[in-house]
Amino acid sequence: MELGKTKSVHIVGIGGAGMSAIAELLLTSGFGVTGSDLSSGEVTERLSERGAVIYQGHKAEQVGESDVVVYSSAIRPAENVEIVAAEQAGIPVIKRDEMLGELMRYNYGVCVSGTHGKTTTTAMIATMLIEAGESPTVMIGGVSDYLKGSTVVGSGKYLVIEADEFDRAFLKLTPTIAVINSLESEHMDTYGTIEELRKAFIAFANKVPFYGRVICCVDWPEIRKLIPHLNRRYTTFGIDEPADVMASDMVMDKNRSRFTVRASGKEYPGVSLNVPGRHNVMNALAAFASGLELGIAPERIIAGLTRYSGMRRRFQIKYDNSAGVLVVDDYAHHPSEVKAAVKAARDGWPNAEIVAVFQPHLFSRTREFADEYGWALLRADKIYVADIYPSREKAADYPGVSGSLVAAAVHKAGGKHAEFIADRELLYQTVETCPQKSTVVLFMGAGDITHLSTRLAGEWINKFSA
């Protein structure tokens, strides 16, 4: 793979899921990669081991003699000293999505979009193609144990990636197959209205060439609204609404799911997933429909889905003992994702006590969706809400907005046990004392709440295995 005379790439915010995936692909393709992030961790350590030069914090001199600087939509260019230094030095500065668009020019692109389920569905399609011997190149915004990372550079023609709607990033991509998993209100700071968001998805879908295909889930009302505006071939999938590819006979048993797929007038029973939840069945349908379009034999699709082993931070079980006590870590941060994670726990472990530990993500999202979070958390037996993970936002810009809004919303929705605990150590101590019997402790959020799940799992492993 060549990008003109480019030999060295500097990535600002290299520790992020999407940025680290680009870094891994560039490293594997022989490019020199440097990068900076405010904090270090497992992701930056892995990149360093693969040959990247990683800096903690941002400094102008770290740009060095890079040929191009890449940054994510979460970065404010005018406030970043590295980007300013690059511009002053005449070094091209581009967003992540533009780099992705360039990388796609060398491959047959399978792009997975949607408000929810992008990472899991992308990983399912990747696993299916690898098991079918297609050797795809894969870029996922998360870490897959099966893939041993977030990126695989294959020798085949397919490039399978997530297509993120944030900041209209996916409109830079040129998919041959465009998957639309789900669609509802999200990123209103970018779009303003659901109508504008829907228009963006229509534009993304219609970028598919005449020989490509759009694969979309008709269980979402907003997707049903966009279908009449598609001017490309499309395949539908769903569970509740009539569709070209459907699931039935679903059985949930702990962290496993079984179901039958109906497609093209045929039935394929006994499809098995090693992940729980109705939402994962839906993700598998998207992968199944994609496989059929790519000409993969149904039995090989099913074999690939069976090999899918989940993603880190997607209902990741970090601790499980013989007494039925589990620690689960999940990336859920939108109300629909939170609801799906709680439902997966409730359906898979119907006799267990479900303890939900939720960290809201972004002040703007918490303010907009507080009531929806209340309803989403309602099926948990105990609910503990941490303070908000701010990410790119500042608390001073959102006076009066805190995790207490979510706890209050749970009570408003009829929940009896919901508590806001801002102090992180107190939150940990409270959760640690919860299990008295079969219990699923479900940590949810896109921020640093994951560290508490790791700490709790580690402590219980040491405590109960001693």
UniProtKB/Swiss-Prot annotation:
Primary location recorded for the protein, binned into one broad class: cytoplasm
Position of the signal peptide: none
Reaction it catalyzes: UDP-N-acetyl-alpha-D-muramate + L-alanine + ATP = UDP-N-acetyl-alpha-D-muramoyl-L-alanine + ADP + phosphate + H(+)
Listed GO CC annotations: cytoplasm
Localization annotation: Cytoplasm
InterPro entries linked: Mur-like_cat_sf, Mur_ligase_C, Mur_ligase_C_dom_sf, Mur_ligase_cen, Mur_ligase_N, MurCDEF_pg_biosynth, UDP-N-AcMur_Ala_ligase_MurC
Residues the entry annotates as binding ATP: 114-120
E.C. numbers: 6.3.2.8
Pathway given in the UniProt record: Cell wall biogenesis; peptidoglycan biosynthesis
Highest taxon of the lineage: Bacteria
GO biological process: cell division; cell wall organization; peptidoglycan biosynthetic process; regulation of cell shape
An MF annotation (GO) of this entry: UDP-N-acetylmuramate-L-alanine ligase activity
Alphabetical list of Pfam families matching this protein: Mur_ligase (PF01225), Mur_ligase_C (PF02875), Mur_ligase_M (PF08245)
Keyword Cell wall biogenesis/degradation recorded: yes
Alphabetical UniProt keywords: ATP-binding, Cell cycle, Cell division, Cell shape, Cell wall biogenesis/degradation, Cytoplasm, Ligase, Nucleotide-binding, Peptidoglycan synthesis
Entry's family note: Belongs to the MurCDEF family.
Function: Cell wall formation.
PANTHER family to which the protein is assigned, alphabetical: UDP-N-ACETYLMURAMATE--L-ALANINE LIGASE, UDP-N-ACETYLMURAMATE--L-ALANINE LIGASE-RELATED
Protein name: UDP-N-acetylmuramate--L-alanine ligase
Species: Chlorobium phaeobacteroides (strain DSM 266 / SMG 266 / 2430)
